[in-house]
């Protein structure tokens, strides 16, 4: 047996079926090369056979695979490689360190990717918002020049080296909600502060002209002065002088000091004040030159200060500098007598509101004699064709004025208005359409249309008739006589007297010499006194007025006649307002007086006809 053992290892792969291989084969292969008889005997023992049987399972696949075909070996080898590789990847016994590292790397990669996407979206959104914001700001700026240097993009212009015009610095909550929202399309407060601190640190002063927007003055280190007045309007004339004096005081302190003037848009109100300042500092000798210079500097198209009333106030300030040495003057007290509309088409019949900086002074919508009438009823045709007149018969005027005042005409085709100053104007002013604010925005054109404003000095409002025995009697005293019927023996003035001066009236005359009304006898009241509507002479007045003036189409010309009862040979009249209240009586009286166009003369007809 020992002689065969050296040949057994070579025959291990060809063990015949049904005969287990000799124990020495396995022992020699597994246990070593011990060929001693003692070693062989130990290998043939039960324990040795048992160990051999156990160890036989391991080489058996290897032995069988050696006899398989090349294709099977290839398939199994590939399968084994696949399963072994899969086992390495899926085995729970694989090292945890590699998985943790892989997971950490994956998480970091995912976080980095999400962060990149988020940052990109945020940056894109910011850029998109900024682009929209820039477009909005440029759209709001319209024709104004912008400051686009040093990384700034502001609605701001250097009018001179020391005078800056800009739009409202918005975007701060101290300006209120709307002021904060306006920061999206107007100058940003932070950007304005950054600009001033960068370019003019410690050398600037801000002038706020807005009455509708304020902000925390501490944002500009307290160097803010406020001279407020409403948008599309004019300031009190004394405010212009005060502004110029304040700005001059700041500029003369240091040659590098600058004034920064703004309203909301930084154009119209700002232009009025800056043009006045240019006049005050004697940059140019005339208001026209100052306005032309400002318009060219501030706007691309040269249309900065365009409202007629604001242009008028720059010229008013020029007069103050020329005639009053820059000193404020008290307002001249006047009475507003009424209005004439020249070349007035039928579609212009406006209601009227008179106001000043303290509030409304007069309005046809609330006055007792006009509040119940439509505008077509209280505008009446004058003897001259194409002229409409408004006044209050029997009253000294519409309202008393002193200084600045505003006339606003409310019309269905669009409102128009103007600001005037009694100290700077004559008692009679004619304004063309180019001198009326907002008239160019009306729907229908009115070529040649003009508004005449008639004033009177407060002491000469109600002139008297020197040829009359009762020249000293006032209209109020005459109106008291209306409570009792007039004596039937009253004499009626001849028609020739009435036709001699059809357009004159003693109440509405500005000059005593122009007063030509009929005189009052000892037994009757004057038939031409506006308040004496109950005298029989009123019948003749209405008759002559009907013959002289075309009043067809006017309601006020037909209704008053119904209240007059006339019999041939009688000089008495039944009261037209019997049994009605004072308001109805006043309205009827207004229509009676309005039927006679002569009561609407202002005593300047000679000059009026020469026009």
From Swiss-Prot:
InterPro entries: C2_domain_sf (IPR035892), Dual-spec_lipid-protein_phosph (IPR051281), Prot-tyrosine_phosphatase-like (IPR029021), PTEN2A/B_C2 (IPR055183), PTP_PTEN (IPR045101), Tensin_C2-dom (IPR014020), Tensin_phosphatase (IPR029023), Tyr_Pase_AS (IPR016130). Residues 462-486, 514-530, 549-565 have a biased composition (Polar residues). The keyword Phosphoprotein applies. Residues 145-324 form the Phosphatase tensin-type domain. Residues 1-42, 87-109, 462-589 are annotated as: Disordered. Its EC number is 3.1.3.48, 3.1.3.67. Signal peptide: none annotated. Residues 100-109 have a biased composition (Low complexity). PROSITE patterns: C2_TENSIN (PS51182), PPASE_TENSIN (PS51181), TYR_PHOSPHATASE_1 (PS00383), TYR_PHOSPHATASE_2 (PS50056). It catalyses: O-phospho-L-tyrosyl-[protein] + H2O = L-tyrosyl-[protein] + phosphate; a 1,2-diacyl-sn-glycero-3-phospho-(1D-myo-inositol-3,4,5-trisphosphate) + H2O = a 1,2-diacyl-sn-glycero-3-phospho-(1D-myo-inositol-4,5-bisphosphate) + phosphate. It holds the Pfam family PTEN2_C2. The active site is at residue 263. GO terms for molecular function: phosphatidic acid binding; phosphatidylinositol phosphate phosphatase activity; phosphatidylinositol-3,4,5-trisphosphate 3-phosphatase activity; protein tyrosine phosphatase activity. The keyword Nucleotide-binding does not apply. The modification Phosphoserine is found at residues 91, 509. Residues 331-458 form the C2 tensin-type domain. Expressed in seedlings, roots, stems, leaves, flowers and siliques. However, at protein level, not observed in older leaves and mature siliques. Residues 495-507 have a biased composition (Basic and acidic residues). Induction: Accumulates in response to salt (e.g. NaCl) and osmotic stresses (e.g. mannitol). Keywords: Hydrolase, Lipid metabolism, Phospholipid metabolism, Phosphoprotein, Protein phosphatase. GO terms for biological process: peptidyl-tyrosine dephosphorylation; phosphatidylinositol dephosphorylation; response to osmotic stress; response to salt stress. Belongs to the PTEN phosphatase protein family. PANTHER family: PHOSPHATASE WITH HOMOLOGY TO TENSIN, PHOSPHATIDYLINOSITOL 3,4,5-TRISPHOSPHATE 3-PHOSPHATASE AND PROTEIN-TYROSINE-PHOSPHATASE PTEN2A. Binds phosphatidic acid. Protein tyrosine phosphatase that also exhibits lipid phosphatase activity. Hydrolyzed poorly p-nitrophenyl phosphate (p-NPP). Can use PtdIns isomers as substrates. Removes efficiently phosphate from the D3 position of the inositol ring, less from the D4 position and not at all from the D5 position on monophosphorylated PtdIns isomers (PIPs). The presence of a phosphate group in the D5 position on PIP(2) isomers reduces lipid phosphatase activity. This is Phosphatidylinositol 3,4,5-trisphosphate 3-phosphatase and protein-tyrosine-phosphatase PTEN2A. It comes from Arabidopsis thaliana. The lineage of its organism: Eukaryota, Viridiplantae, Streptophyta, Embryophyta, Tracheophyta. The gene is PTEN2A.
